[in-house]
Amino acid sequence: RVFEGLAPRLEEVVIIDGIDGRRFTAGDVIDHVKRLAGGLRAAGHVPQQPIALMAPNSPEYCIIFHAVAWAGGTITTLNPTYTAHEIRHQLHDSGAGLLITDPATLAVAKEALEELPEVQLCVIGSADDCLSLSALYGPAQEQQCPVDLDRHSVVLPYSSGTTGLPKGVCLSHRNLSINTDQTAQGAESRAGETAAAFLPFFHIYGMTVMMNLHLACGGVLVTMPRFDLELFLRICQDHRARRMWIVPPVALALAKHPLVDAYDLSALEQVFSGAAPMGSALSDAVASRLNCAMLQGYGMTELAPVSHITPLSTPRSGASGLALPNTRCRIVSPETGEDLPPGEEGELWIKGPQ
């Protein structure tokens, strides 16, 4: 689905590194993805074992993610702030045979692999004592490796582990591509939108709504390795951003921080918040200060992740929105499993192609 979105705009810039300014056209991204996919298959890294990726947002993150998908592999994404113990758990649980990391997280990655000698280490950039990402490139794999798009797990993100250790969630090509299109329709995305991409790509929210949606639907990503309010505001100003994709702590900064007034955000039409609930008071404060619609959605990792979005045409403060196309919901009694009448609290059951 991402390649379908990139193919018609080979000469257009689609990813900008927000730190060093490097620019990648759609043609550049496709070329990098195909050559890395070819190298991964030639080296035997796919499809035998999942490939683990632990790095902050960057153009390379997008390339690695889609190269593994193009090669017919499975990628498991790790939080770059993990401890060595947490890294070991996910690598062992997922069965990953290769860990690709960033120079900033190389030390903790090495510590984690001291007890997992069977896992090979690769670094984005270069390091004297381990494989560099550039060394994995090979002849371009021109055609996507055929897999069952409905059943093959292309990504294995891990849940937050609120009831125990984090658990891997198997998501197929179809799950991701359908949710990308569902979200684009629900959010009324337009070609040419630029996103200040600080939402971490390792998390399903940033993965689908930020990375995949913008690459597939004609947008531009300006990658940020972490949230920085000044950089975020400058990107939104300089690129005349129509929309912000955020989380509630960022909404608080947008509502209260004096730095916001120093930037021209007049092109902004809407702010979309997800990943955690936000009350109507904060929602209204953001909408009032930025003079735009403040929208929310709902989802979870198992839903790839979006199931509900508040429509721009009918914004409702503090609400999570309406179900996306082809998504069915029930509110049932957790004790009996029977549907509850309007106004009653119960358990939300969701079913859909995502």
Please name every model-derived segment.
Residues 98, 104-150, 160, 257:
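ANL superfamily adenylate-forming
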Residues 177-194, 202-243, 253-257:
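Conserved AMP-binding/adenylation subdomain of ANL enzymes
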Residues 241-246, 255-316, 328:
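Gly/Ser/Thr-rich phosphate-binding loop
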Residues 14-58, 62-66, 83-88, 173:
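Conserved AMP-binding/adenylate-forming core of the ANL superfamily
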Residues 1-15:
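A short N-terminal helical cap/helix-turn-helix that marks the beginning
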Residues 23-27, 154-178, 310:
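Conserved AMP-binding A3 loop
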Residues 10-11, 128, 140-158, 165, ...:
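Conserved pre-ATP/AMP-binding loop-to-beta segment of ANL
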Residues 330-350:
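Conserved beta-loop-beta connector loops within the AMP-binding
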